[in-house]
Amino acid sequence: MRFGASLNCGASGWVKSTKSPLTSLWTNCAWAKHNPPFALQNRHCLTPGEKALSGRASRPLRSARVAIFMAFCAPDLACSPKSFKSSTDTAHSDRWLSLG
């Protein structure tokens, strides 16, 4: 994964980045345009074609794996307001991208 990569909105206003049918990333681009980015460190971003490491999004993540497991928005975007409970960042759990 690369830092600060760009996510491109599709015609439907959603982005899907995936290499595997088991793991996909979605973000609501329309929502992102109207919300400022959150300034937190070590945020990864998935570009189209990339994916997070495989695993179950429904289980709590170990703190050491959060940065490499989860995908984050580019610096100029904010994450979609999909709830995702993090073991290290509960205050911003509503800004995590959802994995499904």
UniProtKB/Swiss-Prot annotation:
Sequence ranges of Basic and acidic residues compositional bias: 91-100
**Region Disordered, annotated ranges:** 81-100
What is the protein name given in its UniProt record?
Putative protein p52
- Organism of derivation: Acyrthosiphon pisum secondary endosymbiont phage 1
Q: Which gene encodes it?
A: 52
